[in-house]
Amino acid sequence: MLRRWRTLVAGGLLGAGLWLSGCSAAPVAQESPAAASRPPEAGLDTPLLTRPGAARRYPPREGRRLERRGDFHVDHGVAARAFNERVRFLILHYTDGDDASALRALTGPEVSVHYLVLARPARWAGEPVVLQLLDERRRAWHAGVSQWGDRRHLNDTSIGIEIVNAGYRDTPHGRLWFPFAEDQIELVSRLARDIVQRYDIDPTHVLAHGDVAPGRKVDPGPFFPWRQLHEAGVGAWPRPADVTRWVHRFHRQPPDIGQLHRALAAWGYAVPDAPDAGALRPVVRAFQLHFRPTDTDGVIDTETAARLFALIERYQGRGQALKLLRE
């Protein structure tokens, strides 16, 4: 009995000693493997970095195909499939001057373009030569403040072609426009066809500078042969039979200003908020410069309206053209 009492007392004193020891100093925690692998707390200055295994080494044959950029290399051997092209529009301009003034302006600090077609393009091996001033991957400063459909700032998504041409001169007898040379149009057709094929540019996205900046720009003017360009496989143009049918319809019942306002917007033009004939005039003139160059006064007549709706029918469907008249 006495031995048992001594054992209990000794055990109690030992427990008390351990408890007192625990009060006077924090116990040493044993960190589990899972806790040791946790990421460091936010706010620590030193990030957690790991040391991976041995890096793959390129065989000499593969290594020679790598691109060197400064103090590292790039492997182009794996390609992503989910992407789209920067280029969605082709915009045509004239320079409003001669070769020398065009080159000065387009190689200066304020404006630029991807391609320049000279007044008399040089030839090599029987074929015309165009000047490429900027890589197509780069953003040229050629469209300025611009819009087509829901796209703004078309420098971001377009390739620009400048054609050397004097533009126009105002005279006491009216505005005098200067024509283009046949060899210029031959070269523009070949160049534009190459661009739209490589980037799969929609015909309705081959535009005049005046189309994307109505009222501010008029180039390439009424002498640019858009129909000829279309026949070369580039850009939009209405079918003559469709135009004739719409002319007959509008002779019986012409569209009102609201319907024309909606149709111009549906085609892609940036239109004013209110369907007002005066406010629409610069937009109508831009359309006429492209699709009805024999009459560019900005007034909507039967022929202009017929060409607009014929274009919508051809490229957006007859249902869409009729819907614009019902709304």
Say what each PLM segment does.
Residues 164-166, 211, 272:
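Short strand-loop junctions, especially beta-strand C-caps/beta-turns
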Residues 201-216:
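Acidic/histidine-rich, metal-coordinating catalytic segments
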Residues 1-12:
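Bacterial N-terminal signal peptides that target proteins for export
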Residues 20-22:
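C-terminal motif of bacterial Sec signal peptides marking the signal peptidase cleavage site
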Residues 24-29, 185, 189-199, 215-327:
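Cell-envelope/ECM-targeting effectors and their regulatory/trafficking segments
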Residues 176-178, 210-211, 245-246:
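A short, structure-level motif marking secondary-structure boundaries and short turns
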Residues 30-40, 45-202:
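Active-site-adjacent loop/helix surface patches within enzyme catalytic domains
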Residues 14-18:
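Hydrophobic core
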